């Protein structure tokens, strides 16, 4: 086991980043297709496409909520496994894997029951109207049946990367996404199921991915094994998993809360069409942000393993190169939106009113997108090295501490335009806060490196 993971200490950081991040980027990029492809197909349903895409936009906070719990357990357990493997403790890593599976099951059951019994109230509470209710409910009912697959599949796939198999993790996401892309037009158009068909295609894809990840950890393919006796509740391990996953959880939970508030203020200042426009804008944001989360998925085991092995110089190098790569991706996304926004929006809708609002909103929402990568990668750094509280604060700084006040205050003075410009305002302030914290952390790493050198003399 030790020999299999020694390359994490000796291989060049650039090669490791490519090995782990490229598959993760491709995987997360493809994973974004789950929601984006649904919206593209639904938006092109004759006569009701604009209402269908608005209905999906209404329930999007719930979809994000489900995803946030999968990240809480997935990123947390992956970080714990990486740290234990860095310490050469395989058995403890396997125990964390078992606890992660147990937590995934319990959380899935609780979420499914809550959503099922409160579905109608939830839809109206998060921005549904009489026009969009039927489409929102059709989608959410079936998506709710896929909660166990959505959570456990992503949790196990996150740990696959920490197990040293990033290509297999990428393949898992590709399997699900390609299945979804193939099934969507069949269920939506061929079977005439519309919005229901999109949701059914999605959950079938998620269950296929989930069963594959279970097979991986019970076969000879994996280095650490999913053992039945380890699938149990352990308070201390559950606490550590949740602490280590709290940053990613906060980002997505905050995103869910922000999306709910967005739906509320959009309904007040712009009506159903504005909610539909935001659904399309968020599709682009998801598509552009997922590669950055892919870098996070890839860099996390590199940071965690080398920090656990006291290779602080390599930790700093990985952080710098991760930030650089994320920034390049952000710049590409920013440029694409400004050059090709009209053509890209037409993929989702041919409704002229919806298209016009979306075009303006997309350019405003992504105004400072090039700086977003720095904050996201910095957050995963603190999480990977076992400092979840700092990571949690960085995540909250953008999603809660700054963004929500902007969404409440700016529309009072600027109406609908204030809603669109809330995101770049929050990103600018949060990035400044993150820069100050990262600068202090780098100084601490320098001191740890000096102590290590003196100890080895």
Name these PLM-found stretches:
Residues 1-21, 81-148, 192-245, 303-368, ...:
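Short alpha-helical transmembrane segments in multi-pass integral membrane proteins
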Residues 9-48, 61-76, 80, 105-112, ...:
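N-terminal transmembrane alpha-helices
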Residues 19-38, 142, 176, 205-209, ...:
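Transmembrane helical elements of multi-pass membrane transporters/channels
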Residues 24, 28, 40, 79, ...:
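Transmembrane alpha-helix boundary and packing residues in multipass membrane permease domains
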Residues 29, 33-53, 123-130, 186-193, ...:
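Helix-terminus/linker motif at the lipid-water interface of multi-pass membrane proteins
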Residues 29-33, 75-77, 108-113, 151, ...:
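Hydrophobic positions within alpha-helical transmembrane segments of bacterial inner-membrane proteins
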Residues 53-113, 150-169, 277-335, 339-341, ...:
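Small-residue-rich hydrophobic transmembrane alpha-helices
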Residues 143-161, 169-177, 198-211, 292-297, ...:
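Short runs within selected transmembrane alpha-helices of multi-pass transporters and secretion channels
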């Amino acid at each position: 086991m030790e020999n299999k993971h020694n390359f994490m200490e000796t291989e060049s950081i650039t090669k490791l980043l490519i090995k782990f991040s490229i598959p993760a980027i491709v995987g997360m990029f493809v994973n974004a297709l789950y929601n984006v492809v649904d919206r593209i197909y639904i938006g092109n349903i004759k006569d009701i496409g604009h209402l269908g895409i608005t209905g999906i936009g209404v329930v999007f906070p719930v979809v994000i909520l489900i995803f946030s719990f999968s990240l809480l357990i997935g990123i947390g357990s992956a970080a714990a496994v990486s740290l234990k493997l860095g310490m050469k403790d395989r058995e403890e890593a396997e125990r964390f894997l078992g606890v992660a599976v147990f937590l995934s099951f319990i959380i899935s059951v609780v979420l499914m029951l809550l959503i099922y019994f409160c579905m109608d109230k939830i839809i109206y509470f998060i921005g549904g109207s009489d026009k969009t209710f039927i489409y929102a409910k059709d989608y959410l009912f079936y998506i709710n049946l896929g909660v166990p697959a959505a959570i456990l599949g992503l949790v196990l796939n996150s740990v696959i990367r920490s197990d040293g198999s990033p290509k297999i993790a990428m393949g898992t996401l590709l399997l699900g996404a390609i299945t979804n892309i193939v099934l969507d037009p069949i269920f939506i158009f061929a079977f005439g199921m519309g919005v229901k068909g999109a949701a059914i295609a999605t959950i079938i894809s998620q269950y296929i991915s989930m069963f594959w990840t279970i097979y991986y950890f019970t076969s000879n393919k994996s280095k650490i094994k999913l053992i039945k006796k380890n699938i149990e509740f352990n308070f201390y391990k559950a606490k550590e998993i949740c602490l280590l996953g709290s940053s990613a959880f906060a980002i997505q939970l905050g995103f869910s809360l922000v999306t709910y508030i967005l739906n509320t203020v959009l309904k007040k200042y712009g009506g159903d069409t504005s909610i539909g426009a935001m659904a399309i804008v968020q599709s682009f944001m998801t598509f552009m942000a997922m590669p950055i989360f892919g870098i996070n998925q890839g860099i996390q085991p590199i940071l965690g393993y080398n920090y656990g092995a006291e290779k602080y110089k390599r930790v700093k190098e990985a952080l710098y190169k991760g930030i650089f790569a994320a920034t390049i991706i952000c710049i590409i996304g920013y440029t694409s939106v400004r050059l090709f926004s009209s053509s890209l929006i037409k993929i989702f809708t041919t409704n002229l009113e919806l298209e016009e609002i979306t075009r303006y909103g997309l350019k405003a929402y992504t105004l400072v997108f090039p700086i977003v990568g720095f904050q996201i990668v910095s957050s995963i750094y603190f999480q990977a090295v076992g400092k979840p509280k700092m990571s949690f604060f960085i995540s909250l700084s953008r999603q809660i501490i700054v963004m929500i006040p902007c969404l409440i205050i700016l529309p009072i003075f600027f109406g609908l335009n204030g809603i669109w410009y809330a995101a770049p305002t929050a990103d600018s302030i949060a990035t400044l806060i993150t820069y100050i914290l990262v600068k202090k952390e780098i100084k601490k790493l320098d001191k740890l490196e000096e102590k290590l050198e003196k100890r080895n003399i």
